[in-house]
Every structure is written in structure tokens, then in C-alpha cells.
Design a protein with these regions (language model features):
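Enzyme catalytic cores with a strong preference for nitrogen-chemistry domains
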Residues: 1-214
Length: 214
């Protein structure tokens, strides 16, 4: 990586289903971070997390796509790029995604590969599994973009390292539970960084939804 990137991490609460409100909050945060290269937002920040069966409604899927395009258009001003968590409908498949927004467009999309299906999570019922993701080229750097569970398990991280990623950016919707911080330290920070020898940025959300606290 030859270029020094300045990255801002936006830990925002969100309201499930409030697409415009969530998008407006991201744009307001971006306006305060005008001197950075990239602003990061948590997993599914645009739609709210977990949105559960709301994401299965075609009208909601289309509205989410429109708001993502609106966010992308805002980056035409030459300010910071944004990494935004949302959903993507392709054919009959629905994906949990992160989108890199830069230069007024959606510059890249990566789909979540590891879908959790335990405890409060039933993503295999809702989402299709994305392919193992390739790194994203951004301003002279190769970024690996594991989405939440992608970063907890080794497959995606080691694949990204083998594909030449220089920095891992993991956006999360990881709820609180007893000893969770210690688990993150061991399972994500120490173990996965040691496996790949790559620097890691880990961003989680704040707030709560239903019975979950982040």
C-alpha cells in the first residue's frame, strides 16, 4: 500500500426500515468528516439491523436500492467515499452487502459469504451466500471487506490475504453478550490478524433493536 489513507469510523444508531432517515444521518456524519478519504458505516446501516422479514418485501428492496443510489450520488462532490452496508436483490437472490460509494457512483459491491444461523440470527433463511470476495481497489490500496461473520471465521480472511489484500475492514452488527469483548479480542483481533498478518479495522454498530443491544 503506497498511499496513506485517512479513514473515519461512524458508529451510529439506526432505525429499522427508516431508509431516508438512516441515509440522511450518514450524509450528515460524512459532512463532518470532509477531510478523510473514506467513511465507514456498520453492517446494514442503511436498512437497519436486523431488519428480518422486512427485507423480503419487494417494495422495500427497491426503496433501499434507490437510497443507496442517492448516497452514491452525494459522493460526486469530491468529498469522502463511503462504505455502506445494505441489501442487494439479483434475480431471485437477496444478498447482505457492503457498497463502496465514490465519485458519484457505486464503485464496488461485496456480498456476505458466511451467513450466521444460530441464536438470534437466521440469515440463511433470508439471504443467499455470496462468493468468496476479492479485494477492492481504493486509492492505491487493496481493501478486504469481510462483513461481520466473514471476519469471525477464517475462510474469507485467508482468501482475501491470498488475493493480495493489504488492509481488512470488517463492518459488523455484533450484539452484546457477557464476555463478548473478550471473545472479539481473541477470535477476531488476535487470532485472525495472526492468521493473515494484515492490519484490521473493526467497526460495530451502537444502539439496539428488539432484544439486541450493540
Amino acid at each position: 500500500m503506497t498511499h496513506i489513507l485517512t479513514i473515519a469510523m461512524a458508529q451510529l444508531n439506526q432505525l429499522v426500515g427508516d431508509l431516508k432517515g438512516n441515509a440522511d444521518a450518514m450524509l450528515q456524519w460524512r459532512a463532518k468528516a470532509e477531510a478523510v478519504d473514506l467513511v465507514l458505516f456498520p453492517e446494514q446501516q442503511l436498512i437497519g439491523y436486523p431488519a428480518e422479514d422486512l427485507v423480503l418485501k419487494p417494495a422495500f428492496q427497491k426503496a433501499a436500492a434507490r437510497e443507496l443510489e442517492r448516497l452514491a450520488a452525494a459522493t460526486a462532490d469530491g468529498g469522502p467515499a463511503m462504505l455502506v452496508g445494505s441489501i442487494l436483490k439479483e434475480g431471485d437472490a437477496l444478498y447482505n452487502i457492503v457498497a463502496l460509494l465514490e465519485g458519484g457512483r457505486i464503485a464496488a459491491i461485496r456480498k456476505k459469504h458466511e451467513l450466521p444461523n444460530y441464536g438470534t440470527f437466521d440469515e440463511k433463511r433470508i439471504f443467499a451466500q455470496g462468493p468468496l470476495p476479492a479485494p477492492v481497489e481504493f486509492r492505491g490500496a487493496k481493501l478486504g471487506l469481510p462483513i461481520c461473520e466473514d471476519g469471525w471465521l477464517p475462510r474469507v480472511r485467508t482468501h482475501l490475504a491470498a488475493q493480495g489484500a493489504e488492509l481488512l475492514i470488517s463492518v459488523n452488527g455484533s450484539p452484546y453478550e457477557i464476555d463478548k469483548d473478550d471473545r472479539r479480542l481473541e477470535e477476531v483481533f488476535a487470532t485472525r490478524v495472526a492468521e493473515t498478518s494484515l492490519p484490521l479495522i473493526f467497526l460495530n454498530r451502537v444502539g439496539g433493536q428488539d432484544e439486541l443491544v450493540f
